[in-house]
Amino acid sequence: VWGVAHFVTGRRIAGSLLLALYVAIAAAVAAAATVYRSDLLHLAVQPDVLQRLSAGLVALGAVWVLVVIRSYQILRPLRMPISARALGAAAVAVMCFAVGVPVAWSAHSTYVYRDALTSIFRTGSENGRQVDTEDPFNGQARVNILLLGGDSAADRTGVRTDSMTLASVDTETGDTVLLSLPRNLEHFPMPPGPARDRFPYGFTGDGPLNPGLLNEVYEYAEQHPDVVPGVPKNHRGPELLKATIAGILGLRVDYYILVDMFGFADIVDAMGGVKIKVTEPIPYGLQGAVLQPGYRTLDGKEALWYGRSRTNSSDYVRMGRQKCLMRAIAEQADPQTVLTSFDKLAAAAKRTLATDIPQELLPALVKLSNKVKDGAEIRSLQFVPPLIYSGNPDFTLIRKLASDAVNSDPHAVSAPPSGGQSGSPSASASTPDSPSPDGSQPPKPDSKPVSLEAACP
C-alpha cells in the first residue's frame, strides 16, 4: 500500500499524499467496475479515451514501481550484509515485476485495441458520414446495417458476397429483423444512375462467365468505377451493393459490415471455438470430412464450413445455418473470452472486417447492442424458395414482405417451417405445387419472420 513505508519512517506528509492517491485510484477503479460499469463500454469505443487510458496506465505503472523502490530505500537499514542486500534487491525486483507487468499488459492491450478500432472504423470526416452525437440515428426509428460475408478464395477473382443479410434494428428497443437475400438472386433492378443506365432491364453480369447473380455486384463495381463515379477503390463495391439491396428490399441501407469468410475462421479460433448444435451430417473440405450431428465446439475451419457447405444441401439451407452461427458467436463472445485472446482477436479483426460505420456512431451502437443482448426479439426472414424463387423473383412481394417484417409486432412470430430455417426447405423439399411423397400437399411457405431463438436449436 502506498505511503505505509513513509508513515513508518516518520514522513507523514509524503505518506499521506501517497496513501490518498492510492485510495483515490482504488476507489475510481472500484466505481468503474460497479457503479459506472455500463458506461465503460461506451467509453471503450472512443479512441481519444483509449489513448489517454493507455498513457495513464504507463504513468501508473512507472509511479507504482518508483513507490516500491523508494519504500524499500527508506526502510532499508543503513548497514546490511551483502547477502541481505542481495536478497532485499531480489524481493524488490519481484514486487516491481508483480505490479508492473499487469499494468504494462493493460496498457499494451489498450493500445492494440485502439489500433484495431481506428483501423477498422474511420472517423465521420474521413468517410463523409458525419454523426450528430446528440441524435446519432438522425431521428430514425430503425438503423439498417448490411451484413456481408465475402468469399475471396484463391480460385476466385475478387470478392463474392455469398452471404447478404440486412439487420434492421429498432433504435428504442433493440428488436431486430434479419432479412436475408440469396447469393444467386437474378434479374434484380439496379439503382438509378450509371448502373441502371448500364443495365436498364436488370443486372446481367460481366461477360458470359458471370450469369448476373447478386453476389457478383460487389466485384463488378470494383472493376467498373464508371458505375459508381467518384467513389474510391475498395469502397465502390459496398456502395453499389448497398444501393442495389436497398432497391430490392425497399428499405434504406445505412451502413455495411463485410467479413472475409476465411479471416472469420481466425476470429473463431481466437475465441477458442464456438459451441453449436449440428442437426445433420455436414460434409466439408476436400478430404471427405464430416461434421457429425450433436452439440459440438467447432474450431475456425469447422465453423467456416458449417456456414459455407452446400454438399447434399443447398444455398438456402446454409443461409439458415449462417444465421444460427452468427447468433452463437454473438452470445459466446463474452468479456472473459475477449480478454484471454485479446491480441489474436484484434489482429484477426483487422484482417477480416471492413465497414463504413463511423467511429462517432460506436457509442450509440454499443448502447443499442446491449438492448439486443438483453432480451430484445431477434427474427429472421429469408427470401428463398418456395417463398421467393431466385431465378424469377417477385420484387413487389419481396418489398411488401420486408416492409411488413420491420413494421410488425416483434412478438407475433411464426414457428420455423418444417424442413428448413425460416422458409428454407430441406434439400429434398418438394415444389409448392407438387404433393409430398405421401400424397399430402407441402406446407405453405412462411412469409413472416421467425424467431431466431426458435429457429436455432
Which residues make up each language-model segment?
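Membrane-embedded alpha-helical segments of integral membrane proteins
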Residues: L21-L75
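Internal/C-terminal transmembrane anchor helices
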Residues: P81-V112
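Non-catalytic, solvent-exposed segments at the cell envelope interface
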Residues: A107-P457
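Membrane-water interface of alpha-helical transmembrane segments
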Residues: G15, P47-L57, I82-A89
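Membrane-anchoring hydrophobic segments
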Residues: V1-A28, A32-V35
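Cytoplasmic membrane-interface segments at the C-terminal ends of transmembrane helices
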Residues: A5-I13, W64-A86
